[in-house]
């Protein structure tokens, strides 16, 4: 059985026992989190939501919060001595999907 959930402006296809990385959630590590915005549930009896599946929930265990690898944004203009270097690290939350209920 799998489900498609929406979090952080993105959609994820998840199944039980899967670990996923999502945009940072405002919850403590080692707690459970429930996703209410379930777009679809698949398996032997698939269900599509309009826009969400009614009474469907995905429960996940919060493993940790972390930050991704640093990326460098470098802008320049040729022959003008314009250089601009900026770095960015995105925060994320690592989750373990424990249960999908319909």
Swiss-Prot record:
One GO cellular component term noted in the UniProt record for this chain: cytoplasm
Stretch forming the signal peptide: none
Any single GO BP term: translation
GO MF, one annotated term: rRNA binding
Pfam families attached to this UniProt entry: Ribosomal_L21p (PF00829)
Superkingdom of this protein's organism: Bacteria
Keywords carried by this UniProt record: Ribonucleoprotein, Ribosomal protein, RNA-binding, rRNA-binding
Key word Chaperone present: no
Oligomeric form and interacting partners: Part of the 50S ribosomal subunit. Contacts protein L20.
Function: This protein binds to 23S rRNA in the presence of protein L20.
Similarity annotation: Belongs to the bacterial ribosomal protein bL21 family.
Name of the protein in its database record: Large ribosomal subunit protein bL21
Source organism per UniProt: Aster yellows witches'-broom phytoplasma (strain AYWB)
């Amino acid at each position: 059985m799998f489900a498609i959930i929406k979090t952080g402006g993105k959609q994820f296809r998840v199944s039980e026992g899967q670990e996923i990385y999502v945009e940072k959630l405002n919850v403590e590590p080692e707690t459970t989190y429930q996703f209410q915005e379930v777009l679809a549930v698949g398996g032997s009896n698939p269900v599509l939501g309009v826009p969400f599946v009614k009474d469907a929930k995905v429960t996940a265990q919060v493993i940790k919060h972390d930050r991704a690898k640093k990326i460098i944004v470098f802008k320049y203009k040729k022959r003008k001595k314009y250089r601009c270097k900026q770095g960015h690290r995105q925060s994320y939350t690592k989750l373990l999907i424990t249960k999908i209920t319909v």
